[in-house]
Amino acid sequence: MSRVTRVILIDLLVERSEFGHGGNQEVIQPIAERSAVEVLLVTPQMQSEEAGLRAQEQGLVGISENDVPNWDYEYPFWEECRMEMHGNEVVFRRIAMPLHGDDEMTRDWVRSIGPDAVVCSGSRRNVTMWEEWMSGGGSLMRCSSRMGIPTLGICFGHQLLCHSLGASVERAE
């Protein structure tokens, strides 16, 4: 049996099917050429603090609709989606992530999940207009990159990764 590649994907455009789930599929396609993929989708911008606490305590915690009180219903909620890409199974599964932004605790959580890569999508937001949930996302990206886990930021994800590693990110005039 071949190995399954595990990717944590910070899904910040979930409410836009063409950029959210469609974009996630585009990001995962090259990985799926080589192996089956388990994509663990986290949505810190929509998730409850309680779900984050459960994730910190228990590790891999699936979420239900009750755990995402800020869900944008322009796109329907689902817990899991399976498909085939390049002859390999790809499973997209929504999970909770810690929101606290504490790096030591985030490292423990990342170790318990054991991802092969971490990806942060684009977003309608930017880091120059900071929101509380960005602390948890930034901690995840900072910790994964410092742990030697391949970490990719796309658009906003690039801003968040740079900011979390200490770079100055400014909005262009």
Which residue stretches match the model-derived regions?
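Active-site neighborhood of phospho(di)ester-bond hydrolases with catalytic His/Asp-centered motifs
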Residues: S121, L152-I154
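N-terminal beta1-alpha1 cap of cysteine-dependent amidohydrolase-like domains
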Residues: M1-S139, R146
